[in-house]
């Protein structure tokens, strides 16, 4: 059972309603995570602020963004996020099998993307600390200062949602992704 009840846009605090309507329009429905974030308008605004900055100023294409998100969700073992991001990954052009392989770290990716995901996994798994070897491999694969700095924003927003889902024990409202059947919010 979630620690914070799911609410509708009509029930949410006034400061959250516009954002919820926009999320509902963009996603086709209101997801439990967003309906829970809306209890505290600052939480929903913080999430949307990072997402909007990434959309407006980010340089990664949709497939790269979703691959980063899948890798981070897997490190955090957030089943809710992995299920949501599997849907997002499919929409960005990854096959179902590829989304699972990205999560598992077994995807056959080009050297450049593989190096970027290795850095993302290290950021997510070690409180931001990245080994010199992973950093250098990303540099040698063609990533520059701008992209490696931007990567941190992508990892941060995904850790934000991972932690939030675990914190409030978001109930599933998405189909389980392969390998996550029977999942609960606490995995």
Where are these regions (language model features)?
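Hydrophobic alpha-helical segments
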Residues: 1-187
């Amino acid at each position: 059972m979630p620690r914070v009840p799911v609410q509708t846009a009509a029930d949410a605090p006034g400061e959250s309603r516009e954002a919820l309507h926009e999320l509902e329009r963009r996603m086709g429905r209101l997801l439990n995570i967003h309906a829970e974030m809306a209890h505290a308008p600052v939480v929903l605004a913080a999430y949307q602020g990072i997402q909007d900055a990434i959309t407006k100023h980010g340089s990664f294409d949709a497939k790269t963004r979703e691959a980063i998100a899948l890798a981070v969700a897997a490190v955090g073992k957030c089943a809710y996020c992995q299920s949501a991001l599997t849907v997002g990954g499919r929409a960005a052009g990854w096959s179902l099998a590829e989304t699972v392989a990205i999560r598992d770290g077994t995807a056959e990716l080009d050297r450049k993307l593989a190096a970027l995901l290795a850095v993302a996994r290290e950021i997510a798994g070690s409180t931001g600390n990245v080994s010199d070897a992973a950093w250098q491999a990303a540099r040698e694969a063609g990533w520059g200062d701008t992209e490696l700095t931007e990567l941190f924003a992508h990892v941060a927003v995904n850790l934000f949602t991972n932690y939030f889902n675990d914190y409030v024990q978001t109930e599933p409202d998405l189909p389980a992704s392969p390998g996550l059947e029977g999942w609960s919010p606490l995995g």
